[in-house]
Amino acid sequence: YRYFTAEKQESLLFLIVGIIAVILAVVFWFFIKSNPNFFKGAAIPFLAIGLIQMVVGYSVYSRTDKQKADIAYNIGMEPVSYVKQTELPRMKTVMKNFVIYRWVEIAFIITGLVLIFLFRSNADKTFWYGFGIALAIQAVIMLGADYFAEQRGKVYTNELNKITAD
């Protein structure tokens, strides 16, 4: 149960971060008049990744209670076979996806840092400087959130493996 409770809490936080990022993007795009290229550049990653955070946060938050109840019921009915045939394969996929997410997030961080480094002193390229800063910020947030989710997933998977070892 702790795994699903923590998943739900983090997904709510993810949803809130996504909403804040989208609001920032709208403010940056439509309302900031000083250095507009910088803020328009920053708005794009905040909007794109913020929307992803909102969708992922909402979908995980809304499905977690039912998922927790279904899994608890099935483990209660047929612990070993359900865990072996359904829950461990599901978690194997989840854990494999974290590796993909991690590399994408690292690539975004590196891209953001390269853009920051290349365009930090170039007044004609403030769009890309803003883009790089926002991309790096969002990627670090995603990497951090996924790190903690992956750690919870490892603990949960270890608990599932104990059920099949008995």
Predicted regions mapped to residue ranges:
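Transmembrane helix-loop junctions in multipass membrane proteins, especially transporters and channels
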Residues: 30-37, 62-65, 69, 117-125, ...
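Long, highly hydrophobic alpha-helical transmembrane signal-anchor segments
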Residues: 3-54, 112-122
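Helical transmembrane-bundle signal
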Residues: 21-25, 50-60, 109-112, 135-142, ...
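Hydrophobic alpha-helical transmembrane segments of polytopic
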Residues: 17, 42-49, 104-108, 131-138
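Membrane-helix interface/capping segments
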Residues: 58-85
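C-terminal halves and exits of single transmembrane alpha-helices
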Residues: 80-109
